[in-house]
């Protein structure tokens, strides 16, 4: 994602991808909203240095971006969790939006976008259901999001092949 286009996560779950993308977009450091860290208790912890570093980071935050990040999920429970997680990063409420919607019915936003999706791997649903889901997801993405950039996170190689999408790049990642 180049941070110059709308980002869409059609199976957002708890909203992690959307929220972390929003933080990257606005240059908000990880952990910025935390009030305490374990290193505060270290013997040589320098509170004044910490305040200086934190203020420097604050000065680099840019909330003026005109980009919108959309997360959707079929499960309303996931949307509630996503919204609760977004409450922990209040500066992003103008940028990140969550809604309940089936990924297979999701419309592409106007203009160019990047879709990042982490579909179910088959750990919580049956193998046959995963196969059908990946086939239908591939069809929908090809039709509705044609011409846009797509990133898929999955450890289920067999299911990924069912998407029937042209692969430009592949990366091995450790998730978790």
Regions found by a protein language model. Give the residues of each.
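C-terminal catalytic and target-recognition region of SAM-dependent MTase-like enzymes
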Residues: 101-176
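Conserved S-adenosyl-L-methionine
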Residues: 1-107, 123-124, 131-133
């Amino acid at each position: 994602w180049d941070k110059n286009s709308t980002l869409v996560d059609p199976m957002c779950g708890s909203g992690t991808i959307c929220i972390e993308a929003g933080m990257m977009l606005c240059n908000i450091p990880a952990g910025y909203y935390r009030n305490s860290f374990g290193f505060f208790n270290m013997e040589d912890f320098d509170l004044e240095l910490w305040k200086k570093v934190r203020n420097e980071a604050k000065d680099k935050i840019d909330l003026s971006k005109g980009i919108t990040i959309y997360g959707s999920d079929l499960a309303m429970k996931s949307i509630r969790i996503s919204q609760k997680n977004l409450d922990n990063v209040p500066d992003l409420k103008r940028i990140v939006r969550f809604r309940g919607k089936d990924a297979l019915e999701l419309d592409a936003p106007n203009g160019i976008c990047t879709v990042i999706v982490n579909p179910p791997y088959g750990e919580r649903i049956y193998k046959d259901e995963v196969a059908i889901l990946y086939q239908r997801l591939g069809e929908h993405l090809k039709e509705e999001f044609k011409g846009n950039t797509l990133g898929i996170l999955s450890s289920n190689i067999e299911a990924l092949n069912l998407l029937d999408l042209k692969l430009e790049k592949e990366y091995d990642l450790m998730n978790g």
